Amino acid sequence: MKEKVLALLKDEFPEIDFESSCALVDDGILDSLSITGIIAVLSMEFGIIIPYEEIVEDNFNSVDALADMVERLRG
C-alpha cells in the first residue's frame, strides 16, 4: 500500500518530497491546502471517505502514516 500511495502522491504533488521526510506537517512541508488536496486524491483513488476525526497531524506526517490511514479506512 505504501508504494501505491507514494506513487500517487508523487504524481499529483511533484513539488513535495514525500520520501525524505517523516514529519511532513511538523516541518511545514504540508500546509492545510496541501492536506486538502491529498484528502481529495486519496478519497477518489481508493474510494474512501476520510472523516474529520482522521484529519490530524499524525496521519499526514509521513507516507507510512498516510498508507496506514488508507488501509484502516478501506477496512
Question: Where in this protein do the model-derived segments appear?
Answer:
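Thiotemplate assembly-line natural product biosynthesis machinery
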Residues: 1-17, 68-75
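Phosphopantetheine carrier-protein modules
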Residues: 10-29, 48-54
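Catalytic nucleophile serine of serine hydrolases
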Residues: 32
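Conserved catalytic core of two-component sensor histidine kinases
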Residues: 36
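C-terminal structural segments of small proteins and small subunits
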Residues: 52-74
